[in-house]
Amino acid sequence: MAQALAQPPLVVTTVVPDPPPPPPPPHPKPYALRYMADLLGRIGIMDTDKDGNISPQSPRSPRSPRNNILMGKYELGKLLGHGTFAKVYLAQNIKSGDKVAIKVIDKEKIMKSGLVAHIKREISILRRVRHPYIVHLFEVMATKSKIYFVMEYVGGGELFNTVAKGRLPEETARRYFQQLISSVSFCHGRGVYHRDLKPENLLLDNKGNLKVSDFGLSAVAEQLRQDGLCHTFCGTPAYIAPEVLTRKGYDAAKADVWSCGVILFVLMAGHIPFYDKNIMVMYKKIYKGEFRCPRWFSSDLVRLLTRLLDTNPDTRITIPEIMKNRWFKKGFKHVKFYIEDDKLCREDEDEEEEASSSGRSSTVSESDAEFDVKRMGIGSMPRPSSLNAFDIISFSSGFDLSGLFEEEGGEGTRFVSGAPVSKIISKLEEIAKIVSFTVRKKEWSLRLEGCREGAKGPLTIAAEIFELTPSLVVVEVKKKGGDREEYEEFCNKELRPELEKLIHEEVVVEEALYLPSDTE
């Protein structure tokens, strides 16, 4: 019997299958993909086509040092913001190193939308309103496809972002409101009405001062109809005055005051006074003036807000009345400023008080770079600028071309004198002293500034002296700021009677400006 062979034990191997791969992430919804593509495109990482497909972006000009320079003057930096027709970039002035904000406007878009006149009006308005609490327009440049607004860079962001964190202390809110009213008063005095005042259009600089921006919806006095009213429905719903909602004519200055009242309420309360999810219900509240002040509002503040948010524009408080209000006046300081060499210069009252206490004269302001005629001999002074042919032609009454280059509304006069330059300057200083004007001197130009703060700012007069011949000079006097009537009164009562003594009696202007031809 054959012996059975021993069999090895049976080994059973269990094969465990690999786990299934995880399902792919869900494809983004069309609107989400579109948002992501737009975001990546804006920050310079991806390109997008018309269908929203994204692809790695090729090197772009802003990253190229050569193409990052605008007009040879500014180096473009990061994108600060964008709208339908424009983008705003941080930039740096290559020469001075100063930061600026450059608003880049697409010409094709504004032409298709019929906004060319709108852009021209905004430029005109920004030239009119030169004030420490208003964002300053430095210059406007253009290419075939773009328009560039070179503006003051305000690094503190929107006031809206500050308020979004919570209501402000009363003293802080008061200071912002004072600065707002100061700037709005100046605008109204210059015939400019903002019509879209809101915290989003109020910026803060690095020193915590307010700057009014975005004059895109502004109106100027020349736009008003024969009834003197605006008829355009515009603005942001929560800040619109009730009379604007009626779609009838309204006084733009009074509508701005209403918006200032809403802003003050927002600063103090942390929310708008007429809020409702339903915009039509909100409009009804605005029209009826239905709002409630929080319990922490002082009685003086409540009285002021009641006047500001008066639904009747005829009885609503005015800017001059606001400036006399007890709550408003607390700690208020009139901002003093002047424009020199196209640069806005500000004077703080505290600095003036220190200067007065140190023995300096408050009538004549000087610096190391300025020329003091009384201390320097006339022989050591540089000669005044000589007039070129274009200057001489433009000085002639029949060929006055200054209107092509100067800001609208600049009144002026000129005369020829044979008196020594030192005598002319001394006479202008003497006139300024009589009426307590401040005098600023720089070479052969003087600036006389009144101390009274009018609706259009202090009266400012510039006088420049030009050499016509070795023995004759032309003295040109112009109003640079302030009220026209005040300027005419000053000229008729003070300036002309005194300067007539210096006019060269034997030479009339046209004869002095006579140019012989080459054939004579």
Curated annotation (Swiss-Prot):
SMART domains: S_TKc
Pfam families: NAF, Pkinase
Modified residues (Phosphothreonine): T232
Catalytic activity: L-seryl-[protein] + ATP = O-phospho-L-seryl-[protein] + ADP + H(+); L-threonyl-[protein] + ATP = O-phospho-L-threonyl-[protein] + ADP + H(+)
Alphabetized UniProt keyword annotations: ATP-binding, Kinase, Manganese, Nucleotide-binding, Phosphoprotein, Serine/threonine-protein kinase, Transferase
Binding site for ATP: L80, G81, H82, G83, T84, F85, A86, K87, V88, K103
UniProt cofactor(s): Mn(2+)
Protein name: CBL-interacting serine/threonine-protein kinase 18
Record organism: Arabidopsis thaliana (Mouse-ear cress)
